[in-house]
């Protein structure tokens, strides 16, 4: 999945590209993206869901790589658009250079930077007013602990994203 491949691209290309351009991710992307990027001294910008937000920023600024959970990955040195063929070539090149199975590399990345975790819940509402009321209610009633994990942060960029403490 992209939750595995975007971290792979950042890790692999970060080893061979000599730049410090930032990484773009949508709010729905796993925080392993942030962990890898920060290990390479890259800023990470978290954007609303949708590749259009990534493309807009790629057009305006020098960007290393940007991706979203649905599979869209854009490479800053190529073009500000999703390109599956280019991504496949980068992936195959990396596999050939490392001379190991992809799952082994992905396991190493998760050992070094934490697990890739993704859980998304989409809820349809009959109108915007009801949606806003439910969102406000949830925000006002978020517990300090979730399943015995301390709440670390709340993102309201595009919906509600809860980050819990790893420990």
Predicted regions and their residues:
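Cysteine protease catalytic core and zymogen-processing segment of caspase-like enzymes
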Residues: 1-14
